[in-house]
A protein has these predicted regions:
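N-terminal/domain-start alpha-helical segments
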Residues: 1-105
Length: 105
């Protein structure tokens, strides 16, 4: 068993989504670190290790697809894309860039 709770990087620019997801995760004992834009997500990822990344696609500064692409250049951390974009092409692109799963809000 791990010495620390699993650490999740939750990346979404909507406060309501952040609150909706982070509360139950924290209640279950996960360490949730939040980022509100793509640049902040990449900075947080460089600062500490994560066990999972939950990533929105439509983000300010750097979009979620680019964040995913950059993370995949040096990490195999599981990435779940959580987005309002429900077109099949969006899912295909996200998975091809290295996301492990794609969930529509």
């Amino acid at each position: 068993m791990a010495d620390h709770p699993a650490r999740i990087l939750l990346v979404d620019d909507e406060q309501s989504v952040q609150a909706l997801l982070s509360y139950p995760l924290r209640k279950e004992g996960y360490d949730v670190v939040q980022a509100t834009d793509g640049r902040q997500a990449l900075e947080r990822f460089e600062e500490q290790p994560f066990d999972l990344v939950v990533l929105d696609l439509m983000l300010p500064k750097i979009d979620g697809l680019e964040v995913c692409r950059r993370l995949r250049t040096h990490s195999s951390v599981p990435i779940i894309m959580l987005t309002a974009k429900s077109e099949e092409i969006d899912k295909v692109v996200g998975l091809e860039l290295g996301a492990d799963d794609y969930i529509t809000k």
